[in-house]
């Protein structure tokens, strides 16, 4: 991780590196706020960076992952306690935050009405 940050810093320079980090922080804060505004969802912990998870006490998050995948959004499935969905943010996510949140809200509403459950599996990779 340190080597990757150093390489990015070398490529973009200090001003570019700081601008990139401002963009990433904006993406993370917008997404976190949007997720927490959807009834039933909460972000796990108080993440300071761009890799974190969210869960729900009201919805089956594996069903949420299935439904989001049907809309071409792929979330990491965490078979933890509580089960959660994992996001890894990059600058390419900046223009799609609102689209993602719209789809997540629609999926949450549909699952809340239907009681749909999802496949209990993780999608870890090596």
Which residues does each predicted region cover?
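Mobile "lid/hinge" segments at catalytic clefts and subdomain interfaces of large enzymes
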Residues: 1-2
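Structural signature of PLP-dependent enzymes
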Residues: 5-29
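Short low-complexity stretches enriched in small and charged residues
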Residues: 7-11, 41-46
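Non-catalytic terminal extensions of PLP-dependent enzymes
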Residues: 18-21, 28-32, 37-39, 46-126
């Amino acid at each position: 991780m340190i080597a990757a940050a150093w390489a990015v810093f070398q490529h973009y320079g200090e001003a570019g590196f700081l601008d990139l980090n401002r963009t990433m922080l904006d993406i993370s804060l917008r997404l976190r706020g949007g997720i927490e505004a959807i009834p039933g969802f909460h972000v796990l912990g108080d993440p300071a960076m761009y890799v974190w998870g969210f869960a729900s006490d009201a919805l089956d998050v594996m069903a949420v992952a299935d439904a989001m995948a049907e809309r071409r959004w792929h979330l990491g499935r965490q078979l933890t306690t509580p089960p959660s969905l994992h996001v890894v943010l990059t600058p390419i996510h900046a223009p799609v935050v609102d689209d993602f949140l719209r789809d997540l809200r629609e999926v949450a509403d549909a699952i809340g009405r239907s009681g749909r459950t999802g496949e209990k599996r993780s999608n870890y990779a090596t």
